[in-house]
Amino acid sequence: MTTTKNNGHKKLNVPNKREQNQTCLDSAEREGLRPKGNVPNLRFPEFQGEWEELGLSELLDFKNGLNPKPNKFGKGIKFISVMDILNNAVITYDCIKASVDVTEKELADFSVEKGDILFQRSSETLEDVGRANVYIDDKTAVFGGFVIRGKKKGEYDPQYFNYLLRSPFARKRIIPMGAGAQHFNIGQEGLSKVKLHFANIEEQKKIGKMLSLLDERMATQNKIIDKLQSLIKGIAQHCIRELINGWEYVRLGDICKITTGKLDANAQVENGQYPFFTCAERPFNIDSYAFDTEALLISGNGANLGYINYYKGKFNAYQRTYVLDHFSVNIQYVKWALKVLLPQRIAIEKSSSNTPYIVLSTLADLKIPIPNNSKQNHIADLMMSFERKLSTQLALSDLYNKQKQYLLRQMFI
């Protein structure tokens, strides 16, 4: 999408990054710089020659999964479900959640072995139909009825095949095979019609190894983020609970102004100029602002009930998002006090009145300990330093993900 920008009295059409990349590729192809034929844009230099187009049925034998009775679950051999396909970079025996008791015949008919590919049969959205994953463990598992197994019969590198099936090129060929139903489904016949391009086995191994190493680094990064978030939560709880005895408690409504936004949740604009805070964790965009202040934004309902954002500047807000501003104490200290104390208050009100949203009195009457200014500033500075560290780690995780998506676009055809 091209963005129009004002430059004095002239309007300049500035192409976005995707358009710029495509322009570069088109230009390179015209000048003979882009590889021609069945080869990817990005390739290890030691490999040459075109890739071979093969049907999935030339490499895999397809079969629908097992539908055990409910009393068979909870013991026995590991049982691969759709969630195991979606929630893991690769499937190993230990990462499979469910177990099932099967007969010897069922084990023979529905076994999953190293190198087999598992496909999601049904999805509520067309974009997710036919999602796939590879089983890379030496231990035998079985698979469920909402899964299609591709039993390995041809030569391929399992890791390469896994990443190929996640590439935009493969998704464009698989998705149409699941169209045309209320719940989008793909069957063995549809998968058998899909044709994809395969490198020679040595090139497959190198591509699969490189991308698997990137996935390992991304998994490590996620662990770093999880540990850091846990540390931050623990330190915040320690700091606030340390203040419970010996300091004055005040009503939140007495140290700030509490209002809400006025807009519907669907008021966002794709390329709007200002942040638009709803009950989602991240703000959307909008073309108009109703607030120009330093504030805490608290989600008043939905899945992220009680989620707290901080913002300083011009913004707008959803009618069920609470806007807290004009603080008489350190706003950053209050933010962390609320992160500790508000979930407890919400849990109490949910259990007593089953209220799935925050009412004004929930916030206004919430009492929080207020230490002296020096203590407030110390806690605020400490927690902000951890937030900066977390932001750095989250940005690095986002960078790894963008790098992976780029490689999936450029290293496959």
Regions found by a protein language model. Name each.
Residues 72-73, 91-93, 270, 288-291:
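Short glycine/proline-enriched turns and hinge-like loops at secondary-structure junctions
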Residues 41-66, 193, 242-263, 267-278:
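Non-catalytic DNA-recognition/assembly elements of restriction-modification systems
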Residues 81-83, 96-166, 278-343, 349-363:
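A short beta-sheet element
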Residues 36, 67-70, 140-146, 178-202, ...:
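A short glycine-rich beta-alpha junction/loop motif
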Residues 1-55, 198-251, 367-413:
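Amphipathic alpha-helical coiled-coil/heptad-repeat segments
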Residues 73-91:
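Short beta-strand/loop turn elements enriched in aromatics
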